[in-house]
A protein has these predicted regions:
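Membrane-interface helix/helix-cap signal primarily in integral membrane proteins
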Residues: 13-16, 20-200, 457, 532-537, ...
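Non-globular, low-confidence helical/coil segments that flank catalytic cores
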Residues: 75, 90-100, 105, 123-124, ...
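N-terminal Sec-pathway targeting helices
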Residues: 1-12, 465-474
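Hydrophobic alpha-helical transmembrane segments in multi-pass membrane proteins
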Residues: 17-18, 186-354, 370, 416-492, ...
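Feature for secretory/organellar precursors and membrane-associated catalytic proteins
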Residues: 54-57, 296, 502
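Aromatic-rich juxtamembrane segments at the membrane interface
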Residues: 126-257, 262, 336, 498-500, ...
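Hydrophobic alpha-helical segments of integral membrane proteins
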Residues: 148-166, 170-173, 178-181, 189, ...
Length: 758
C-alpha cells in the first residue's frame, strides 16, 4: 500500500469515519436550523422558502422539485437550510437555475419507522436535504434560468419520447438502462429483476460508462481523430451523460474513474484502478461523509473492490485457471464482498443471481448499445429505431423469462436478515483470512510453475506435492461457510411481538422461541403499497422466509390490504417468502373482502382455515386462544365480530382485540375467561368507543400498544381512552410516535423496544 499513497489515504479516511460512527458521532451533519426555529416551524407549519431549482419531475399526484442554495424566511430573517425537496400542489412552468419563492408545510425528513424500512433521512442527508415541503404553492419565480441545464433536460425528455415510440412496452426498461430514469418503471418489473439478482443492469454503472465511453473514444479514433481530441471529447461527453442521467453515486463513481482512466491514456500514464477508486471515494466522502453508510456507495465501490482485490484470489482457491472457469468464479468474489451490505440494507441475497448473471452480463452490452443506437437513429427515423432496437428487445424477453424462472423457485434468494455490526466485522475477518489463503496459493502455484519450467518436471509431479494447497482450500471453504452462517445467525429463545408502524391500521409480527413466525393483520388506510414497502422489508430484515400462519381479525382494508398484496406477490413469484395458513374469522356470511383474501391465498398456495371462539392453536411453547367471534357469528358487523386472541407463553399473556367496541367487550366479560394480561394491543386504534373502564379493570394490562397514524380523521387515539389506560396503570406505547414497538419476553420478564428512540 506504500506504493499506492492514495489507497493508504483513502483507507485511513474510511477507518476514521467508521470509528466516529461506532463511537456514536453521526456522519450526518444534522439539522441546519437553530433549535428555536425548528420548534416554531413545528408549531406553525406554514413556511416560506426561497431556493434555486436544481431539477424537477412530474409525478401522478404532484410536481416534485429539488431546490439548492435554499433559505427559510422566518420572522423577516433568512436561515440557510441547504437543499429542500418540495411537492407543488399544481404543475408549474419551471426551469433549472430559476430562483423561486414557495409557501407550504415544511417537515423534517424522517428516518425509518420499521425494521427493514428505507432510511429516507440518511438517503437525503447524503444529498444535503433535511426538509421536505408538502402542499407547496409557488409565490414568485425569476425569469433567469440555466440554459445549459435546461438543454440537458430537454435532450433527456426527447430521448425518453424516442424510446417510447421505438421500444413500446419495453420503453421504461430502456429508459432505466440508457437514461437512468426509473420514473415509469413498473414496480413489479423491479421486484422481478431484484429477485433474479440482475437489478444492477437497470442502474447507470461502470459497465455502461466503459461501454459508451470507450466505444465513443474508439469510434473517434477510427474516424481519424488523434488521442488528445478523441479523449477530451469522450471525457466531456461522459461527464455530460453522467449529469443528464441524474448523477447518482454509482454513476459519478463510474464517470470519475473513466475520467481518470482516459486522462491517463491521453497523457501516456499508467492507469491504476485501485488508486482511481480511492481518489473517487475520497472526493465523494469529502463532499458528504454520510455516503460511507449509503447502500449505493457501498455496493458500487464494493463491486469494484470485489473484482479487483478478491476475484483472482478466489479463483486461485477454486482452482480456476482457464478463462471460462475464471468467468464462472469471479462473480462469486463480487458477491462475497458485497454480501453483508446486501443483507444489511435489503435482508436478502439473490442466489439465482450467481447463475443468471453469467447469462446476462455478456449480453447487457447489446441491450445498452441497442438502446443508444435507437436514440441516435430515432432523431432521423422512428421505423429505423424500431428495427435497430429489436435484438435488444428480444434479449429483454429472455431476461424476463429468466426472472420468471427465478420467481417460481423458493431457493432463488437467501433471506438471511439484517446482521449486527459484530456479525459483519467477524464475517469480513473470515473473508480477509480466506483472501490471504488465496494469495498464498496463487504465489505457490506461480513458484511451482517456474520450478517446473526450470527443471523440466512433469505437471503430474508438480501437482503431486500440492496436498498442502488442497488442505488450505478446504480450510478456506470452512472459513467462508462459518462466516456466512455467523452473518445469518439470529438467536432465538424468547418470544418477540413487533407491532409495526403501518400508519392508520394494524400489522403485528410474532416470532416464537422455536423460530415459528406469524402475522396478525397487515393493512393501512394512510400508507399505500404496504406489502411492498413495510411488510416485505420487515419480514426480510428479521430473516423470515416462512410464515406459519397469517391471522386476519376482520376484513376492514386497514387490516388486510397489505396482507392481500403480500399474498399476490407470493402468487406471482415476486418474493420467495411463503406462508402455511391464512386464518380467517369463522363468519357464516363472508363478505367480498373475505373471499378475495381466500382466493389470493389459494393462488399463492396458502391453505385457508377459519377460527372462532374456543379454538386453540398451539405452536410449541406458545399458544393462541381464540376468544371471539362466536361460532354462530354472521359477520355482518365486521368490527364487533372481529377475531379476538390471547397469546400465551409461560407466565406471559398478550391480548389482541382487533376493532371490537364496548358491546363486544361486555360480551367477553359476561362470558368469562378473561384474565390479567401483560400486554394489550389496544382495540380500534385507541377509539373512544373501545377499551372501556370495566374491560381494563378485568384484564389490568401492564403495557398497552396503540397503532394509528399521527394525523387521522378519526381522532385516534382518543384522549379519553388514553386516560382510561393510564388510570388502569398501563404503560402506553404509540407506533405513531416511536415507530414499531417490540415486546420481548422469556415468559417471565418483559422488555419493550422502540424503533425510533427520539
Amino acid at each position: 500500500m506504500a506504493k499506492r499513497p492514495m489507497c493508504l489515504l483513502c483507507f485511513l479516511m474510511v477507518l476514521s469515519l467508521g470509528a466516529l460512527e461506532l463511537m456514536g458521532i453521526p456522519l450526518i451533519r444534522g439539522n441546519p436550523l437553530p433549535l428555536n426555529v425548528q420548534e416554531q416551524i413545528e408549531a406553525h407549519p406554514g413556511s416560506i422558502i426561497c431556493g434555486e431549482v436544481e431539477q424537477y419531475e412530474n409525478t401522478e399526484f404532484s410536481q416534485s422539485v429539488y431546490l439548492k442554495k435554499t433559505y427559510l424566511i422566518h420572522q423577516s430573517k433568512k436561515f440557510p437550510i441547504e437543499n429542500v425537496r418540495i411537492f407543488l400542489k399544481k404543475e408549474e412552468d419551471l426551469k433549472p437555475g430559476m430562483r423561486i419563492l414557495v409557501k407550504g408545510t415544511l417537515k423534517r425528513v424522517e428516518g425509518p419507522a420499521n425494521p427493514g424500512g428505507f432510511d429516507s433521512q440518511h438517503f437525503y442527508a447524503c444529498r444535503h436535504i433535511y426538509y421536505f415541503m408538502k402542499n407547496a404553492v409557488l409565490q414568485k419565480k425569476t425569469a433567469v434560468y440555466s440554459g445549459y441545464r435546461q438543454l440537458l433536460l430537454e435532450i433527456k425528455e426527447s430521448c425518453r419520447q424516442i424510446l417510447k415510440e421505438a421500444a413500446g412496452k419495453d420503453a421504461p426498461v430502456f429508459c432505466a438502462i440508457t437514461l437512468g430514469d426509473k420514473q415509469e418503471l413498473d414496480p413489479e418489473t423491479q421486484m422481478r429483476y431484484q429477485l433474479a439478482g440482475i437489478i444492477h443492469i437497470l442502474a447507470i454503472s461502470g459497465l455502461h460508462i466503459s461501454i459508451l465511453g470507450m466505444g465513443l473514444y474508439n469510434l473517434l479514433k477510427k474516424m481519424g481523430l488523434g488521442i488528445w481530441p478523441a479523449g477530451i471529447f469522450s471525457l466531456g461527453a461522459m461527464l455530460q451523460y453522467g449529469i443528464m442521467t441524474g448523477g447518482s453515486v454509482s454513476t459519478m463513481r463510474a464517470v470519475t474513474m473513466f475520467l481518470i482512466a482516459m486522462g491517463a491514456r491521453i497523457t501516456g500514464r499508467i492507469y491504476d484502478m485501485m488508486s482511481a477508486l480511492s481518489v473517487t471515494a475520497m472526493m465523494i466522502l469529502v463532499e458528504s461523509p454520510a455516503y460511507l453508510l449509503d447502500s449505493g456507495f457501498l455496493l458500487s465501490f464494493g463491486c469494484v473492490l470485489g473484482m479487483e482485490l478478491a476475484a483472482e484470489k478466489i479463483c486461485a482457491l477454486a482452482g480456476a485457471e482457464k478463462k471460462w472457469t475464471k468467468a464462472l468464479v469471479s462473480p462469486i468474489a463480487l458477491q462475497l464482498v458485497t454480501l453483508p451490505v446486501m443483507l444489511k440494507f435489503f435482508g436478502e441475497v439473490s442466489i439465482a443471481g450467481f447463475i443468471l448473471n453469467l447469462l446476462v452480463l455478456p449480453s447487457v452490452g447489446v441491450v445498452l448499445t441497442g438502446g443508444m443506437a435507437a436514440l441516435l437513429l430515432g432523431i432521423l427515423s422512428i421505423p429505423a429505431a424500431k428495427l435497430v432496437i429489436l435484438p435488444a428487445r428480444v434479449l429483454l424477453l429472455f431476461y424476463e423469462y429468466l426472472c420468471s424462472l427465478a420467481g417460481r423457485s423458493g431457493w432463488s434468494t437467501w433471506i438471511g436478515g439484517e446482521p449486527e455490526i459484530w456479525q459483519i466485522l467477524v464475517y469480513y475477518g473470515f473473508l480477509i483470512t480466506v483472501l490471504f489463503m488465496g494469495q498464498y496459493i496463487k504465489e505457490q502455484l506461480r513458484k511451482k510453475k517456474a520450478v517446473s519450467e526450470e527443471t523440466e518436471l512433469s505437471e503430474e509431479r508438480v501437482e503431486a506435492g500440492c496436498w498442502k494447497l488442497y488442505a488450505i482450500r478446504i480450510t478456506a471453504g470452512i472459513f467462508l461457510a462459518v462466516g456466512i452462517l455467523i452473518l445469518g445467525y439470529h438467536p432465538a429463545g424468547s418470544l418477540k411481538v413487533i407491532c409495526l408502524d403501518v400508519g392508520q391500521g394494524d400489522g403485528i409480527l410474532v416470532e416464537t422461541p422455536e423460530d415459528h413466525h406469524f402475522l396478525i393483520d397487515g393493512g393501512s388506510s394512510s400508507q399505500s403499497d404496504l406489502g411492498r414497502y413495510c411488510l416485505l422489508p420487515a419480514l426480510k430484515s428479521q430473516g423470515i422466509s416462512w410464515l406459519d400462519g397469517i391471522f386476519i381479525s376482520h376484513t376492514d382494508q386497514d387490516h388486510i390490504n397489505g396482507v392481500k398484496e403480500l399474498l399476490e406477490y407470493m402468487g406471482k413469484g415476486l418474493t420467495t417468502i411463503r406462508a402455511g395458513y391464512l386464518i380467517l374469522p369463522a363468519w357464516a356470511e363472508r363478505p367480498d373482502a373475505w373471499r378475495e383474501l381466500a382466493e389470493a391465498a389459494k393462488i399463492a398456495g396458502v391453505k385457508v382455515m377459519t377460527a372462532g371462539k374456543g379454538d386453540e392453536l398451539p405452536c410449541g411453547k406458545v399458544s393462541f386462544s381464540v376468544l371471539w367471534p362466536e361460532k354462530n357469528a354472521t359477520g355482518k358487523d365486521v368490527n364487533e365480530e372481529a377475531m379476538v386472541m390471547e397469546l400465551s407463553f409461560g407466565d406471559f399473556q398478550m391480548l389482541f382485540t382487533g376493532d371490537i367496541g364496548a358491546d363486544t367487550e361486555k360480551k367477553l366479560l359476561a362470558a368469562g375467561g378473561l384474565e390479567d394480561v401483560d400486554c394489550l394491543k389496544v382495540g380500534h386504534h385507541g377509539s373512544r368507543y373501545s377499551t372501556t373502564e370495566a374491560f381494563l379493570e378485568k384484564i389490568k394490562p401492564e403495557v398497552a400498544i396503540i397503532s394509528c397514524s399521527l394525523t387521522n380523521t378519526y381522532g385516534h387515539p382518543s384522549p379519553e381512552t388514553v386516560e382510561r389506560l393510564k388510570a388502569a396503570g398501563s404503560q402506553v406505547e404509540y407506533t405513531m410516535k416511536n415507530g414499531a414497538i417490540t415486546v420481548e419476553t422469556d415468559g417471565r420478564k418483559l422488555k419493550i423496544g422502540r424503533f425510533r428512540k427520539d
